[in-house]
Amino acid sequence: MKILAGDIGGTHTRLALASAEGSRVGIDKSERVLNAGRDGIEQVLADFLAGAGRVDAACLAVAGPTDGLSARFTNLPWQVESAALSARFGLPFHLVNDFAAVGWGLNTLTDADIAVLQTGQEQANASRVALGAGTGLGVSLCVAQADGPHRPLDSEGGHIGFAPTDAEQDRLLVWLRAAYGRVSVERLLSGPGLIGLYRFCLAEAGRSATMDLAAPAAARAISEAGKAEIGRAHV
C-alpha cells in the first residue's frame, strides 16, 4: 500500500510517499517546500505526485482545527477540503490536526528515539503532552485508554492566555499587549514569538537591534545570538 503523508505548517509543507506492509512503513520519497507565494496546497501536491504512480490513500496533518473533512489554517491563508482533493487526485484524503498526528506518533517511539532532559518516575496510564514551537505553538494532550494506545485530543492550546508570574513578565505582557491586544502563549513560544521576546529584551536593556528582525531567518539568528553573553543575560 502506498500512502501520501503530509504535514502542512504555517511556514513549510513536508510531504512523503510511504510504502506500508503490515506494521512496517518505509519512506520512498520526501520533500519540504515553502508555503510563501503559493495560493494553496493543490499545486504543491500535484508537483510532488508527478510521476509517483499509483497512490492508495493520503493523510494530511494541518496546523489548525479540522473535522477530518475540511480545515482552515491558523497561521496561513489557506483552506483545504478533503472532497476537493480526492476529486482532483483520485484517492481518498483524510485531514488531521498536526499535533493530533504528533500525539499518535508518540505511541510508536522507542527508547532509542528519545532524549531524556529530566529523569522522573514513569507512571502507568498517565497522560502525556506534546508541545512544539514553530510558526505557532502546537499542543497535544494524550490520554490513556483501557483497550489501546494513548489517544490524542485535538487542541488549539497555544492560544490560551499568557499568565505572568513575576514583575518582569508583567512588563512583558504590557509590552506585547500594546502590539497585539490579547496575548496568547503562542505570542511568546513560537518563531515570531522569539522575535517579540528579543525586541522586549532589547527595549529593557536600552539597546537597538544589530540584525534585520524582518528577515525570514531572524528567529534563527536570534537563537544564535542567544548563545552570546548579552543574550544569556536576558534568558
Each model region followed by its residue ranges:
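Short coil/turn connectors at secondary-structure junctions
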Residues: M1, G90-L91, A124-R128
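A mobile "lid/hinge" subdomain adjacent to the ATP/sugar-phosphate binding pocket shared
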Residues: A179-R232
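Residue-level signal for inorganic ion chemistry
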Residues: L15, L85, L194
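Glycine-rich phosphate-binding loop of actin/hexokinase-like ATP-binding domains
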Residues: D113, L117, A124-V185
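Short beta-strand-loop/turn "lid" adjacent to the catalytic site in phosphate-handling enzymes
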Residues: G51-V96, A100, W104-D113, A130
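ATP-dependent carbohydrate kinase catalytic cores
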Residues: D67, H94-Q123, P216-G231
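Short glycine-rich, Thr/Ser-proximal phosphate-binding strand/loop in the N-terminal lobe
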Residues: K2-D47, G51, L153-G158
